[in-house]
Regions:
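Active-site-proximal alpha/beta segments of enzymes that process anionic O-linked groups
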Residues: 71-328, 402, 433-434, 438-464
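A long, amphipathic alpha-helix that forms part
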Residues: 134, 283-289, 325-370, 407, ...
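Histidine-centered active-site microenvironments of extracellular/periplasmic hydrolases
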Residues: 165-169, 366-417, 454, 468
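A short beta-strand-to-alpha-helix junction
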Residues: 212-219, 337-348, 392-403, 414-441, ...
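Polar, surface-exposed loop/tail segments
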Residues: 380, 420-428, 432-434, 445-480
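Short glycine/proline-rich turn/loop motifs
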Residues: 202, 264-268, 329-339, 417-423
Length: 481
C-alpha cells in the first residue's frame, strides 16, 4: 500500500492505495490457487487429527458445523468473485463494493486479491486514457467564450447554502449577486459519485454513463481546449503535480492528474504547492496571471479544498461566524451543533473565496461555471456526518449527490454574448448530471470534434433532459423514493 497524499490530507483522513503495474489478473488466479491448496492441506491434517482425538459423533458435529458455516458464507463468496472477475472498470468495481459485493473479503488474502484486481484495472484504464487523449483532435473552434473559468468546490452540501434556501446566512456574497441578477442558479444538478477522485474522472472525461464503450476509450476534455489554442491552467488545493511528495493522487480517479506525461499534455500550467486556506490558492492564481500578462484564450480550472473535513481547518479563526447557539431550535447535542457550526463557517468562508474569484475576472470577457464535486451529511436528514458508501436512499442522495451549480458572466461577456446568456437563463431548471460537464464547457468555447455532443449540454436546444442520471453507475437518481 502506498499513501498518495500530502501532510494535510494525512492528518485529516488517512487513505491507502495500491499503485503498481507488475501484477496482472492471471497472477490473482495463481495466488488464489495457492491459497486453496494451503487450505486443503490444513483441512486434511485437521481431519487426521480429529480422527485420532475425537470419536465419530464429535467428528460429525465438527463436519456439520464447518459445512453450515461454508453454506452460510457461500453467497458472500459468490458475490466477491463476481466483483473480482466480472467487473470491467474501476468505477464498476467501486459501484459494486457500495452494494456490498466486497462483503466476502474477510481475510487478508481476499483483500490482496481485490487490491491486485483494482491495480490491474487501473493500469489498463490509464494506458487507454493515455492513448485516447494524446490522439484526440478537434474539427474547429469559434472561441465563442475567450475566457472560461471552471471552479470546482469540495464537499458542498447545497442544502447548507443560503443560495438554495438555507435559513442561515452562509453565502451572503452569492445571495447578493443573485439578487442583482448576476448568477444563473441551476436547481436540479446531481453528481455521479460522492468520491472526489471518481467525480474528477467522470467530469474530465468526454465519456458519460450510458455510452457503449468504456471510459478508457474517451479523451479528457482539456486536451481539446489545448488543441483549440486555449491556455489551460489548473490551480488545485488538493491535487498537486508532484504527486506522492507534494499532493494527492488516487487510483480510482485523480490518478491521471499524477501522471506527468498526461498532465503536461492537458495543462499549460499547474501550481506547485497547496495553500492552507483557499484564499491562498487564489493569491497564487493572481500572481501567475499577473506574471504571464494578457492571453487571448484561457481555460482556468480552480479546485478548492472547500468544506472538506476537518471543517474547522478550512477557515481562519477570524472568519468564524456561527456558534452552537445558532442551532438551539434543532435540539441537538452540543458536539453535533459544534460540527454543524464549523461546516457552516467553512461554507461562509468559501463564499468569500468564490467572490474573490469573481472579482478577479470581473473586468475580463469571462464566464465562470461553479460546481461542487459532491455533498456531505451534516446531521440533516440522517443523524450522521460525512458520507455513506453504500447503495443510497433518497434521503442520502439529497444530501450527498445533489450539488450546487451556477454560472456567472462578466459585464463584458453579457454584452457580447447575449445568445449564450439567454440560453443559460432559460436552462436553469433542466435536470443535469456533472458527468456531462465537459460538454457544457465545449459548447461555451465553440469547440467541435467527434467528441462534441450537444444532446449532453444543458444549455443547448438539442439537450436530452430525459437521460437517466446514474449514481454509482447503477442507481437511477430520479427513480429513488
Amino acid at each position: 500500500m502506498i499513501v498518495q497524499t500530502d501532510g494535510r490530507e494525512i492528518s485529516d483522513f488517512l487513505t491507502t492505495y495500491v499503485n503498481t503495474s507488475i501484477f496482472m489478473r492471471w497472477k490473482i488466479v495463481v495466488l488464489f490457487l495457492l491459497f486453496a491448496i494451503l487450505l486443503l492441506m490444513f483441512f486434511y491434517h485437521f481431519q487426521l487429527d480429529c480422527e485420532k482425538r475425537f470419536p465419530r459423533a464429535y467428528q460429525m458435529i465438527i463436519i456439520s458445523l464447518i459445512s453450515f458455516l461454508f453454506v452460510l458464507e457461500l453467497p458472500n463468496q459468490v458475490k466477491f468473485f463476481k466483483l473480482l472477475f466480472s467487473s470491467d472498470t474501476i468505477q464498476e468495481i467501486e459501484g459494486m463494493t457500495f452494494q456490498n459485493y466486497d462483503k466476502g473479503a474477510a481475510t487478508p488474502m481476499h483483500r490482496l486479491l481485490l487490491s491486485l484486481s483494482v491495480t490491474s484495472h487501473t493500469d489498463n484504464l490509464l494506458r487507454n486514457i493515455h492513448q485516447a487523449t494524446l490522439e484526440a483532435e478537434i474539427d474547429s473552434c469559434s472561441h465563442e467564450s475567450p475566457h472560461i473559468v471552471l471552479v470546482i468546490g469540495e464537499t458542498y452540501n447545497k442544502h447548507h447554502s443560503q443560495l438554495y434556501g438555507y435559513p442561515l446566512q452562509t453565502t451572503p456574497y452569492q445571495a447578493q449577486r443573485n439578487a442583482a441578477g448576476e448568477l444563473f442558479v441551476f436547481k436540479d444538478v446531481v453528481t455521479p459519485w460522492n468520491i472526489t477522485s471518481n467525480v474528477f474522472t467522470s467530469a474530465f472525461s468526454l465519456w458519460h454513463y450510458g455510452d457503449i464503450e468504456s471510459i478508457g476509450h474517451y479523451p479528457l476534455f482539456p486536451i481539446l481546449f489545448k488543441r483549440a489554442g486555449y491556455q489551460v491552467r489548473f490551480f488545485s488545493n488538493q491535487y498537486i503535480q508532484d504527486g506522492l511528495l507534494r499532493g494527492g493522487t488516487n487510483l480510482s480517479g485523480g490518478f491521471f492528474l499524477g501522471d506527468e506525461v498526461l498532465s503536461d499534455s492537458l495543462f499549460n500550467y499547474r501550481n506547485e504547492s497547496p495553500s492552507y486556506f483557499d484564499m491562498g490558492l487564489i493569491r497564487q492564481l493572481r500572481e501567475y496571471v499577473d506574471s504571464v500578462g494578457n492571453v487571448p484564450y484561457t481555460l482556468d480550472i480552480i479546485h478548492l479544498i472547500g468544506q472538506h473535513f476537518s471543517y474547522k481547518k478550512r477557515y481562519p479563526r477570524s472568519a468564524e461566524y456561527f456558534h452552537i447557539t445558532d442551532y438551539k431550535s434543532r435540539h441537538l447535542p452540543n458536539e453535533q451543533s459544534e460540527l454543524i457550526a464549523a461546516y457552516d463557517n467553512a461554507t461562509r468562508y468559501n463564499d468569500l473565496v468564490i467572490d474573490s474569484i469573481i472579482t478577479h475576472y470581473e473586468h475580463d470577457d469571462a464566464i465562470i461555471v461553479y460546481v461542487a464535486d459532491h455533498g456531505e451529511e451534516v446531521f440533516d436528514d440522517l443523524p450522521v456526518r460525512g458520507r455513506l458508501f453504500q447503495e443510497p436512499s433518497k434521503r442520502q442522495a439529497n444530501q450527498e449527490f445533489e450539488v450546487p451549480l451556477w454560472i456567472w458572466c462578466s459585464p463584458a461577456y453579457r454584452s457580447s454574448h447575449r445568445k449564450i446568456v439567454d440560453e443559460i437563463k432559460s436552462s436553469v431548471n433542466q435536470p443535469f448530471m456533472i458527468d456531462d460537464l465537459s460538454q457544457l464547457l465545449l459548447y461555451l468555447a465553440g469547440i467541435h470534434s467527434k467528441w462534441t455532443n450537444h444532446s449532453c449540454c444543458p444549455i443547448s436546444k438539442e439537450y436530452n433532459s430525459s437521460r437517466p442520471r446514474l449514481i454509482y453507475g447503477k442507481v437511477d437518481y430520479d427513480k429513488l423514493k
